[in-house]
Amino acid sequence: MPLLHVNGISVPCKAILFDKDGTLLDLMEMWGTWAESVLRDMETHMALIGAGFTGDKNLLLGTVQDAKGRITGYDPGGPLPMATVEQTYGILAWQLYAAGVPWNDAIVRVMGIAKDAMNELRERRAAKPLPGLLPFLAQCAQASLRLGVVTSDESHTTAEHLEWLGISSYFGAVVTRDRVVKGKPAPEMAEAACRELGTLPEETVVIGDSNADMQMGRGAGLRLAIGISSAAGTAEHLADADTVVRDFTELTVSV
């Protein structure tokens, strides 16, 4: 059985599951840019109806902005890295509803704003792999490890992002939020990925950047839960991780 080496320990495993945003790809490069566009357009839209955000707009998605409105960081325990598409729509639509827009219209308007922001990303194919990811995936393939993706994103956007990164062929299972009844931190996504890869939970490792990933792994009985803390620079938000790394340069695989 291949060995995964991390922080001085060697773990036998047959499969590794990866979160997508903030794990496979740089979250700020993708969703920081998206959030910047969405919040800007939301602010403009609300000004047109004589309204404003009910509070600090950074608290909507858990972003950190500079004086010019550019997003420079995010709360690792906030909506930007963890919320599903539907949850994000709900957070944003509530602002319009509070300003007097009927809920159904608020949802439609938010979906339009979010779609425009995503189309901007598509034009740039805005996906950047985390440091060391591509060599690490090559090591995994060489060791015949089975790889899967478990993400709170939806199927069509996940497929796009993996294709932009050029890594689609590495993964034998891609479990997205729209494929399960209960998303993270429930164990269902990890359990489904293990079934599709043909491995047992105790032979499988999960790597992710949120504590929801760690809780999912623990709930599914996975062998090890590895947290990635590169975006926040701290591991405090990864309370349920077995061990924490900055990026994939701190992981190696051997046979």
Say what each PLM segment does.
Residues 5, 11-131, 142-143:
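N-terminal helical cap/lid subdomain that shapes the substrate entry/recognition surface
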Residues 123-128, 152, 182, 223:
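Short, flexible loop segments at the rims of nucleotide/cofactor-binding pockets, characterized by
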Residues 23, 151-153:
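Conserved phosphate-coupling serine/threonine residues in phosphotransfer and NTP-handling enzymes
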Residues 85, 129, 151, 206, ...:
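Charged, low-complexity surface patches
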Residues 1-16, 44-45, 134-141, 155-255:
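Asp-based, Mg2+/Mn2+-dependent phosphohydrolase catalytic module
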